[in-house]
Every structure is written in C-alpha cells, then in structure tokens.
Amino acid sequence: MNIVLFGPPGCGKGTQSKRLVAERGWVQLSTGDMLRHARAAGTELGRRVAAIMDGGNLVSDAIVIELIEERLPEAKAAGGAIFDGFPRTVAQAQALDQLLLDRGTQVDSVIELKVNDEELVQRLVKRAEEEGRPDDTEDVIRKRLEVYYGQTAPLIPFFAQQGKVKAVDGMGSMDEVAAGIAAALEEK
C-alpha cells in the first residue's frame, strides 16, 4: 500500500509516518529528511538545497523526484511506502503517479492532517528549539506556510478527483491522530 501523508509543515506527518513504519513495516519516504541529509552532507547538491531551504522555498521537482525514485525499490520490497512531504506540487503528483504506474502500483490513499496555523507555528518553533533546526525560525515557518497554501494545498483537488483524500483531525494527541489515520486507512 502506498499512502501520502499530507498537510502543512508541523502537522505531524513525520511523527505519524514513523509510527506507521513501526506498526506496518512500510518504508517512510520523507523528503524533508532526505533533503536535510543532503544538506548536512555538504555536497554541491546539499549546498543548493541549503540555500533554497534557508529561504523557505521549495526544492525543485527534479531534485526531489530523483531522491524519491532512488528509494522506490526499497518501498516495493517492504510492501508499501508512506510519502511524507511529497508530492508538494501538481507536477510532482503527476510524476509520482507515473513512477508508481511504471512499477505496477499507485497511490492508494491520501491522508490530509488538518491543524490550524497558530498551532503549527507553536509546534515548529518548539521543535526548532528542541532539535536545533536552523530552517525553523518563525519568519521562515510563516513563509513555509504561505508556500504550502499557495503551491501545495492545491494538490487536494488533484487527489480528490481520484477519490483518494481522507481528512484526519491533526489537533489531538499523537494517539488520537494515529487512531484517526488507522480508521481512514480502513475506509474503502
């Protein structure tokens, strides 16, 4: 099964992805983690990624799709993938559909985690302090939310036309959100 965890920065995609990996054995394909790893590696690609992320902007489709494509064989072997932070644009969604179709599979479900903006900012500022994430200043967080609503939120209609979107309240405890996701995945 291939699922997309969808929602604004700080809604809990990473936390819930890790939980699904532990419970179901699927592979987490977190573009945020992959991009932070590339950044930390200090390669030419990592330096380009750092400059883009530090400005609160989206990394190019070509870079992100290349990172995802490299991990698809691992996901197939595990029986499924959780796409966390990908796709972020309609072009990326179309590319993902094609990548999966070429491998005889598809996105089975899109879980939209719903959290209000002020809660998102509070969560991200706290995470930045706890984890030392230089890309999570309050100004950059607000810019990331603007980018999300302008460029990524329009994906909801793209996947809704395919009948794949299931909204889950992301404002509860981690366990409550996990229960909401589990219920959504059982829906047909």
Swiss-Prot record:
Keyword Nuclease listed: no
Catalysed reactions listed for this entry: AMP + ATP = 2 ADP
Compartment list: Cytoplasm
Broad class of where this protein is predominantly found: cytoplasm
Positions bound to ATP: 10-15, 127, 172
Gene Ontology CC annotations of this record: cytoplasm
GO MF term set: adenylate kinase activity; ATP binding
Keyword Nucleotide-binding: yes
Pathway the protein takes part in: Purine metabolism; AMP biosynthesis via salvage pathway; AMP from ADP: step 1/1
Assembly, per entry: Monomer.
Protein name per the record: Adenylate kinase
Natural source organism: Maricaulis maris (strain MCS10)
Upper taxonomic lineage: Bacteria, Pseudomonadati, Pseudomonadota, Alphaproteobacteria, Maricaulales
